[in-house]
Every structure is written in structure tokens, then in C-alpha cells.
Amino acid sequence: MQYAKISGTGSYLPANRVSNDDLAQKVDTSDEWITARTGIKFRHIAAENEKTSDLAAEAAHRALDAAGLDSGEIDLIIVATATPDMQFPSTATIVQQKLGITNGCPAFDVQAVCAGFMYALTTANAYIKSGMAKNALVIGAETFSRIVDWNDRTTCVLFGDGAGAVVLSASDTPGIIHSKLKADGNYLKLLNVPGQIACGKVSGSPYISMDGPGVFKFAVKMLSKIADDVIEEAGYTAAQIDWIVPHQANRRIIESTAKHLGLSMDKVVLTVQDHGNTSAASIPLALDTGIRSGQIKRGQNLLLEGIGGGFAWGAVLLQY
């Protein structure tokens, strides 16, 4: 049986690191307030000349190095992002060009906001299991600093920029064991960016609009449910999970999922304090951090899970 296994990971964070105290000088907030409610202490903000594709390409280079592959061996590129470089072409094709890949491999974007990496990873898994690809580059990359209203203290403290990437390769040994994706558009008003560009004009707000309590309540409920579903459908138990690698949006949401599964926070890769919410980039960023720190080891079982606007959510159970 053919599996899709992670052969390398990489990540990239912009140099500009912004603390809660830095933000407190611009909006009415404090380090204590932000930390108590979210667990966030820092976030990274892209430079004016840094685009989402730049962050993605840097993370991709590091993932390729870790996998021991040349960029020309990649035969599929999927970029999960809600902040593309431009309306079109896809950010994935721009990354393809920046990596010097000229073999004509498919390259496209997936937009499921904070669940985007789950959607992209599941799609790449299907390509590999069907024999349509051997080495897929799956990237989550965001520049959310460009869609945040920096005068809105309820949202500007939450988000950061960054990118994470994995190389997913065909393997005879288990990699991705099971995944599940869900969506419900009935909740779109809880979290969105309503602005549109039409006929050369911007209509609606170009900034993130969020009902914080509504998002929290829905996220806690659905992440617990999908974690249960993926583990049970794979024939596993929560006790067999070595690490949870969650979407890094809010420490309290992460703690809730771990508690529901009966797992301690010692089994959670936690980066929200250093990165903030980087949307589609958060899970691959956390995954790469866990691997490079030595926390995550080969052969261990990982549960990746996340939820984003739409709502869209998903979980992936894999053996690293």
C-alpha cells in the first residue's frame, strides 16, 4: 500500500518581532490582558517588501533541505493562504517560479483560512496515494498583518505573519493515517473579511471582522468532535497520540481540546505565545518547531487539527 509520509519540514518568520508591550503603545491594551485571554506574547510582522510568496519560498527551501531533495524533484505544489500576493495567478505558481521549478508540475492555492493547511495536506495525500505525485510541497503562508485593522484592539493583538512547509513523499511505510475535513457556511458572519474589489473599487471593510465569543464557543465544540472522529475512525485511541499539533489561535481553545482527549499539555506542541495566530501557517510552523526542537521524533503519532472562518475545520492523524 502506498502512503504519504512527511520527509522534511521548514518554516520562516519575518525578522520584525512585536511584543504585547509594543502593541500597548499603540492601542488600549496590555501584556497582562492579551496573555490572560489568548496566551500570546509575541508575533512576527512582515516587512513592507515581503510578500506571502517570499515567506512561503523561504519555508519551502528549508523543508527541501530537510528532505534532502532538489526542487526539481517536486511534482506538486499546494499553498494554503488567505492572503495571496495578488488576485491571480496563485501564490503557488509564484512560489514555483521563486524555487526555480521548471518541470511543469501542478501548482495551486487552497483557501480555508486557519484550516487551510489541513485541507492542503489532505489534498496532497490524495494525489500521492493515487500515484499522481511522488513528492508534494505543501505550504501554509500568511501575511495577516495586511488585513488587520491596527486600531482595533480586539483583533490586532491576535495575528502574525509566517510560513511553514512540509515535503510529503510517497512511502511504503505509514505516514498520513486518516484525515477528515468539515465546513459549515451558516456561520460565516462570525469571522470574515467582507471587503471586495470590483470595477477598480473596494466595497466593504478590508479588515478582519470577528465575533470572538462566538468563534471560541464553536471552535471548542467542533475541534473536540473532529479529534474524536479522526482517532476513532482510524481505529486508534487518544492514549496512542504522542503529540497534538493544533492551530495556534488561542491557548484556552488548545487546552480545551487536550483536556477533552484526556491528554496533558505536555503532549501539545505550543507556539502561540511566540507566533500569535498565523492562520494557515500556524500548524506547519508548530510542526517544524516541534521537530527541530527534538520534541517530535520519528515513529510518533501526531494529531494535527485546526478551524478557521467559514467555518472550515479539519484534523489529520499521521505517523511522523
From Swiss-Prot:
GO cellular component: cytoplasm
Record: active site: 114, 247, 277
Pathway this chain belongs to: Lipid metabolism; fatty acid biosynthesis
One GO biological process term: fatty acid biosynthetic process
Pfam families membership: ACP_syn_III, ACP_syn_III_C
InterPro entries xref list: ACP_syn_III_C, ACP_syn_III_N, FabH, Thiolase-like
Main location: cytoplasm
NCBIfam families documented for this protein: fabH (TIGR00747), PRK09352.1 (NF006829)
Oligomer and partners: Homodimer.
Name under which the protein is recorded: Beta-ketoacyl-[acyl-carrier-protein] synthase III
